[in-house]
């Protein structure tokens, strides 16, 4: 693999999130956040081992940039929902730390402003 290329990994955290890899500005891979079911209540959570496998198989290394959306509590989400989201966020940070990947936290308003998506429908940011 040509290591002279710029590689950016964008991660939308949470069990409904996704991963996108750009190489020299071109999307080369997208996938849903890997999840697993935990316990008898069928609680979904981020699958740390599978996330690590994705990053390793895509040859993501210390020279690449990992951008993790840094989101905060949403009105009406509830304590259990926020705890679950925080757990997912922590799993992603832990996987990146274990793989020695440089992690950059970016607030939604910053990346949406960069792509002129402020005040747009949520679906506009998914395309």
Q: What are these model-derived regions, one by one?
A:
Residues 1-127:
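Phosphate- and other anionic-substrate recognition elements at nucleic-acid/protein interfaces
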């Amino acid at each position: 693999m040509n290591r002279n290329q710029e590689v950016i990994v964008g991660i939308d955290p949470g069990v409904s999130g996704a991963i996108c890899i750009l190489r020299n500005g071109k999307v080369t891979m997208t996938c849903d956040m890997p999840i697993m079911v935990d316990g008898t209540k069928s609680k979904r959570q981020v699958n740390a081992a599978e996330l690590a496998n994705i990053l390793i198989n895509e040859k993501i290394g210390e020279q690449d940039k990992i951008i993790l959306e840094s989101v905060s509590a949403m009105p009406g989400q509830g304590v259990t929902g926020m705890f679950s989201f925080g757990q997912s966020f922590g799993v992603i940070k832990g996987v990146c730390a274990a793989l020695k990947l440089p992690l950059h936290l970016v607030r939604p308003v910053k990346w949406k402003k960069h792509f002129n998506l402020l005040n747009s429908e949520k679906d506009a940011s998914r395309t």
